[in-house]
Amino acid sequence: MGWAGVLLAAGCASPGGQPGEASGQAWSGRLSLRVDSEPVQTFSALFELRGVPQAGELILTSPIGNTLAQLHWAPGEALLKNGSQTRRFDSVDALIEAATGAVIPVGALFGWLAGREERVPGWRPDLSQVGAGRLQATRESPQPRADLRIVFERA
């Protein structure tokens, strides 16, 4: 299911979960993802990312504050909550791929947001603007190409 499917399935979900469920680092801001598939998929949302690569949560909300999806992960499990539905996956990578059509390297994302050069095959992060709260990363392979742009601040 692509982001459009997540959005349609999510509708106007209300927030759930407990604040601070995942300890570690925290960021918030806006993200956009473009996957050059056929047809092209685009998605943008406000986000809150908390935790560490091994266990954390990502909450996506619309500009007017409706929760679009909540992603929670821990070793061996990843959950996608949207509305009253919960879908389970074996890993956060499988969860992200099912939701977006592209594997976004969550482990590396934590490093990139912290300004660390984390190497991921096929991905090219641009960390030149991280100090100003901007990150861009492009996935060249495998196809389709994906472009991730994030404007963020530490939460």
Language-model segment annotations:
Residues A13-S14, R87-A155:
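Mature, soluble, non-transmembrane domains
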Residues L31, G76-K81, G133-T138:
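Short polybasic amphipathic segments
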Residues L46-E48, L68-Q70, E77, R124-L127, ...:
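Short, surface-exposed charged micro-motifs
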Residues G11-W27:
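Bacterial Sec signal peptide processing site at the extreme N-terminus
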